[in-house]
A protein has these predicted regions:
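Non-ligating segments of multi-cofactor redox enzymes
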Residues: 1-213, 220, 226-242
């Protein structure tokens, strides 16, 4: 929580800066110009290398939008438990999560295609991320951003209904990170022989409904929040070969 707070306060634009690097590549391709390295790509490159070496820890701890999602979900959870006396953590069924996780790839493809075709300029004022960046910079978006404001509000509502709603379902950078080849030493493992019978707490607690040592095609969906490690009664979940 402390790391998330520090990054939210001091580095709220990391997400948008990283995507600006991706965007600059496709803008150069659209203009039939050589791709030139820039400060945006510095951030993009560093985050991609970190993801390959250590997994999606940026998503888990350093993304301001992800931290906002955590805050919205935990606030909703507190209200449910303290006021409405609801037990347990709420969220979508696994089958629904699996379907919605694909939306971010569709959104990424749409954004990149719109850049390549020159249609991206028509999206001016519609980006909820631009609105969020303005707010974290202490600026109020004007009326031209009304669609972006409305979309941000809808995302905030979604954050209340599912843990890591934006990260899992809508984040275009999350889609990029999820497609990166993550080193095996950065993946979570467990010794199944040490697991209590019919436990399954790690998968139940995972926002993405992932099973440790399960379907490796889904390993990119892990946002490295370490919730599985925290809830394991046997401290049986680890990264690397230990």
């Amino acid at each position: 929580a402390a790391i998330e707070l520090v990054c939210f306060i001091f580095y709220p634009a990391l997400f948008s800066t990283a995507f600006a690097g991706i965007k600059s590549i496709f803008q150069a391709l659209a203009a039939h110009q050589p791709i030139t390295w820039n400060s945006f790509l510095d951030v993009t490159g560093v985050l991609l290398v970190i993801t390959i070496l250590f997994g999606r820890h940026f998503c888990g701890y350093a993304c301001a939008f992800g931290s906002l999602g955590d805050a919205m979900y935990e606030l909703t959870l507190f209200i449910r438990q303290k006021i409405f006396h609801k037990k347990g953590r709420h969220g979508y069924p696994e089958k629904v999560v699996r379907v919605l996780q694909k939306v971010k790839y569709i959104l990424l493809a749409f954004l990149l295609l719109s850049i390549l075709t020159g249609w991206y300029a028509n999206l001016q004022g519609m980006s909820p991320w631009d609105v969020f960046s303005m707010l974290t910079a202490g600026k109020l978006p004007n009326a031209s951003y009304k669609i972006g404001i409305a979309l941000l509000i809808l995302i905030l509502i979604g954050m209340c209904t599912q843990e890591r709603f934006f990260c899992q379902f809508l984040c275009p950078m999350g889609a990029v990170f999820a497609m990166m080849p993550i080193l095996p030493t950065a993946l979570f493992h467990r010794n199944r022989e040490k697991c209590p019978a019919k436990c399954g707490l790690c998968k139940k607690r995972c926002p993405a409904h992932l099973e440790i040592d399960g379907d490796t095609s889904l390993s990119g969906e892990c946002i490295c929040c370490h919730a599985c490690q925290a809830i394991c009664p046997k401290q049986n979940i680890h990264t690397g070969d230990a």
